[in-house]
C-alpha cells in the first residue's frame, strides 16, 4: 500500500525535495501503524506493553504528538494554537477512556466526548489544513486522529472489537463490491449531480490513476466514517441496548 501511494504521490509532485521525501516517510509510518492495529495480535501486544499504567499508555500518543509538532514545524505552520489543539484532541480522549476502562463496554458520556472531540476538531477546522505530502496529499491530521482514536479505544479503553480488521474473506469482498456499486449508482452519483458536488469536466486523470483514487477514497473517506459511526458509535450503542434489554422484567 505504501509503495502504491508513494508512486502515485511522486507522479503528482512537480519537484522532489527533502520535504516531500520526509513527508512520504512520515506517511508510511502513520499508515503502517494504522494498518497494524487492524491485526488483533498487534493490539494484544500493545495492551501488554503499554496498558499497565497511565504513563506508559500515553507513550504512543506522545510519539504522535511529537510527529505532529515536527511536521508542522517543517511546514512553517507551528503556532501557539497549533501546539495546544493537537495536545487536546490526542490526550483528552485518552484520559477519559483510561478512567472508563473498567466499566461495561457501552456508550456513556466519556466515550461520547472522546469521539466528539476528535470529530469536531477536524470538522470545524480547529486543526491546521496540513496535507501529507504537502499541497497534493491527504489530510495529515486525519491520519493522526485515526491512529489516536483507534489506539485509545482498542488499547487504552480495551474495547473488545470495533469491527476493524485486516483479514477480509470472500464474503466481505463480495458484499463490499455489491454495496459499493449500488451506492455509487443510486446514491452517490445522482445526489452528487443534484447538489453540484459532482460536475462534468473535459479534464480527465489518466486511467491508471483511477484504482489508486478509489483506494484513497476508501481509506481516507470511507474508513474514517466507518470507524467513527459503525465501529464506535454503533457498537457502543448496541452494548447499551443489550444492557437495557437484559434489565427488562
Where in the sequence are the language-model features?
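Membrane-interfacial, low-structure loops and terminal tails that flank and connect transmembrane helices
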Residues: 40-58, 161-172, 238
